Amino acid sequence: MAKKPDADQFNVLRKIQDNPNVTQRKLASDLEISLGKLNYCLRELRGKGLIKMSNFAKNKNKLNYIYLLTPKGIAEKAKLTINFMKLKMKEYEELKKEMEK
């Protein structure tokens, strides 16, 4: 069963809030999605104004990004969290009814 795009965005926002210094490769690995899909998702989130990306020098030869949720991103994550919890409660109730049969 494929995840909805909102689920991917919710998971990316959650991981970024937990660790703004996470690398794209680590984030993609943790979320079990391709690097290309993650890049697409990050561009979408940035385009919606939900995250900011800033460069910083990890060492003198390599730049890394830091990902920060904007106030709009924090509000969107809260909304997605509520929707996710409602979905899980609905699934729980359906499974509970199924088991009672």
What does each of the following model-derived ranges do?
Residues 2-9, 23, 54-77:
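Short, cationic-aromatic polyanion-contact patches
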Residues 29, 46:
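Alpha-helical residues within the helix-turn-helix
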Residues 25, 36:
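Key DNA-contact positions within bacterial/archaeal DNA-binding proteins
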Residues 10-14:
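Pre-recognition alpha-helix immediately N-terminal to the DNA-recognition helix
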Residues 75-101:
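Amphipathic alpha-helical dimerization/coiled-coil segments
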